[in-house]
């Protein structure tokens, strides 16, 4: 078992270190959340004792994980528990994640519709591929229907669960236009719901990340949106509103998916918050202590005026001019 976990973890990291790093970052973000009992799902069974989740032990072991490049270069003496934990984080029976070229972002923009306003290019881009039977089941549900591509924004801590369990309509808290999973064709809108959050301290991607999901959505009547009737310019009212909607029709650029089987995450856009440069830190310190700086400069000015008006200084100055 020890060799199996070590070999599996090494193989995953060697194949795509950035994708492996992303999984560790999403796991760490969920673990550090105050909602960790609900967002850290799945949870490693080896840390569940007597029907209780040992978060403290898991936090301690996660805190000891080196960055993945260092882990690859480490000797075989590396703690078994480290390899077991990394192997668990990187394992999945239903999907695999791999890093994609930034040029793929242009393809995503075409799939979701060209943006009307400039949008930030992600620092990292990842694609998710699903194994059978999950992949076959999705295409069986799709049948001959088209696919819609749209963005879903959420807090970083939620993505560990989103990746492994999918997006669930009943868990969505944004319900102004009815119960469902909310998506948008506008990346700038999705980013509002994806604030930067604390990830993994040893991440190669960065310690503070923002993540947006690009979803594949089956064009089905259970996907509510502003769409026109077939062969008509008239809005299809049956798809524009959800039953018991408090806000009326679903607004343009939004999609509300009311059936979990109709969508899945296909890409992940990751934005890394850059660390401020030293000069920026110094400027920030000056801004924070502006009153003290102003008073110091004022006192220095008074001292200069006092010295220049003294008789000793006048005598010295007159001798210099001779």
Swiss-Prot record:
Cellular compartment(s): Endoplasmic reticulum membrane
Residue ranges of every copy of the PARP alpha-helical domain listed in the record: 5-91
Keywords in alphabetical order: ADP-ribosylation, Endoplasmic reticulum, Glycosyltransferase, Membrane, NAD, Nucleotidyltransferase, Transferase, Transmembrane, Transmembrane helix, Unfolded protein response
Site (Nicotinamide-stacking aromate): 193
Annotated GO CC locations: endoplasmic reticulum; endoplasmic reticulum membrane; endoplasmic reticulum tubular network; nuclear envelope
Family recorded in the similarity comment: Belongs to the ARTD/PARP family.
Domain notes: The PARP alpha-helical domain (also named HD region) is regulatory, it packs against the catalytic domain.
Matches recorded under PANTHER family: POLY ADP-RIBOSE POLYMERASE FAMILY, MEMBER PARP (PTHR21328)
Name under which the protein is recorded: Protein mono-ADP-ribosyltransferase PARP16
């Amino acid at each position: 078992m020890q060799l199996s976990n070590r070999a599996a973890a090494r193989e995953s990291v060697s194949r795509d270190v950035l994708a492996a790093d992303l999984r560790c970052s999403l796991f760490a973000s969920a673990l550090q959340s105050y909602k960790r009992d609900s967002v850290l799902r799945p949870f490693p069974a080896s840390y569940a004792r007597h029907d209780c989740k040992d978060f403290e032990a898991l936090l301690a072991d996660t805190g000891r994980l080196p960055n993945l490049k260092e882990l690859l270069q480490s000797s075989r003496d590396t703690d078994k528990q480290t390899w077991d934990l990394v192997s668990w984080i990187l394992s999945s029976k239903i999907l695999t994640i791999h890093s994609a070229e930034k040029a793929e972002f242009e393809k995503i923009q075409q799939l979701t519709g060209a943006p009307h306003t400039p949008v930030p290019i992600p620092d990292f881009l990842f694609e998710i591929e699903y194994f059978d039977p999950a992949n076959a089941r999705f295409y069986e549900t799709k049948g001959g229907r088209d696919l819609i591509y749209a963005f879903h924004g959420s807090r970083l801590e939620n993505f560990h669960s989103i990746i492994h369990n999918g997006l669930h309509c009943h868990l969505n808290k944004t319900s102004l236009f009815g119960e469902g999973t909310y998506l948008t064709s506008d990346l700038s809108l999705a980013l509002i719901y994806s604030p930067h959050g604390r990830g993994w301290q040893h991440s190669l991607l960065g310690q503070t990340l923002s993540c947006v999901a690009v979803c594949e959505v089956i064009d089905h009547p259970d996907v509510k949106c502003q769409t026109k009737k077939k062969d008509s310019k008239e809005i299809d009212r049956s798809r524009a509103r959800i039953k018991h909607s408090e806000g009326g029709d679903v607004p343009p650029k939004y999609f509300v998916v009311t059936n979990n089987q109709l969508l899945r995450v296909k890409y992940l856009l990751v934005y890394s918050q850059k660390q401020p440069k030293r000069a920026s830190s110094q400027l920030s310190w000056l801004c924070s202590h502006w009153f003290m700086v102003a008073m110091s400069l004022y006192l220095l000015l008074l001292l200069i005026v006092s010295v220049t008006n003294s008789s000793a200084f006048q005598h010295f100055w007159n001798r210099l001019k001779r």
